[in-house]
């Protein structure tokens, strides 16, 4: 369902340069690791959902025994597979809303941890409950799910953002805003989506996602976000 759109995105974006959210893993995964690290200890398999071209997956491969990077875009997975990556990291094309694909992962790998950065806010509202159930099915009894997502009203935030953001050229501002989703996710939606008997949202709160767009003083533009950590009680 989502593969066609994202494949077109990667075909276009990677001909012109990196997407705004492509930042070094040290500025993304490593910061998130402070939250999910202790919860990912029961199983050594990590599913990196929305892996894109695989930089996050490769970084996770240095922390865990087995990492599977999944993305709906065949072009992104093609780039990831062609890159230099460790033998404990593999890449697959797959759609979170595809129950058969998700069941296949469960059969192949059993309980797993899930790292998901900036994906849920791109899922259509009617599909989100189904996707949340698929994710809980994958973590099973021993795994955990960490997600960090673009916050609500994100475009309005940047249209009224700090003076530093508005000092950027107008064309850059508009390009940045046009790449953001119209609606984000908030903590209450995360709590509702993953409210299933036996599972607990143990940590949640506000955060930010780094981008590779720099302000005039050299600091990166940050996107307000929310995070959640879910596991079996």
Give residue ranges: language-model regions.
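A conserved beta-strand element that flanks and buttresses the S-adenosyl-L-methionine
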Residues: 115
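Class I (Rossmann-like) S-adenosyl-L-methionine-dependent methyltransferase catalytic domain
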Residues: 1-107, 123-127, 134, 144-233
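Hydrophobic adenine-recognition pocket in adenosine-nucleotide-binding enzymes
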Residues: 119
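Conserved helix-to-beta-strand junction in the class I
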Residues: 137-139
């Amino acid at each position: 369902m989502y593969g066609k759109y994202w494949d077109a995105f990667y075909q276009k974006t990677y001909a012109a340069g990196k997407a705004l959210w492509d930042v070094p893993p040290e500025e993304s995964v490593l910061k998130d690791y402070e939250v999910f690290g202790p919860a990912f200890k029961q199983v050594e398999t990590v599913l990196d959902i929305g892996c894109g071209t695989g930089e996050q997956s490769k970084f996770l491969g240095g922390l865990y025994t087995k990492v599977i990077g999944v993305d709906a875009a065949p072009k992104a997975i093609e780039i990831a597979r062609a890159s230099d990556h460790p033998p404990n990291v593999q890449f697959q094309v797959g759609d979170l809303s595809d129950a058969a694909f998700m069941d296949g992962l469960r059969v192949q790998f059993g309980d797993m941890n899930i790292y998901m950065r900036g994906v849920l806010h791109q899922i259509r509202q009617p599909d989100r409950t189904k996707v949340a159930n698929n994710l809980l099915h994958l973590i099973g009894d021993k795994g955990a799910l960490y997600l960090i997502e673009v916050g609500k009203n994100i475009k309005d935030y940047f249209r009224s953002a700090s003076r530093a953001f508005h000092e950027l050229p107008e064309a850059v501002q508009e390009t940045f805003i046009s790449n953001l989703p119209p609606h984000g996710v908030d903590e209450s939606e995360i709590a509702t989506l993953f409210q299933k008997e036996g599972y607990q949202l143990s940590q949640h709160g506000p955060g930010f996602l780094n981008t590779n767009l720099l302000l005039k003083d050299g600091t990166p533009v940050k996107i307000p976000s929310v995070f959640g950590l879910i596991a079996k009680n």
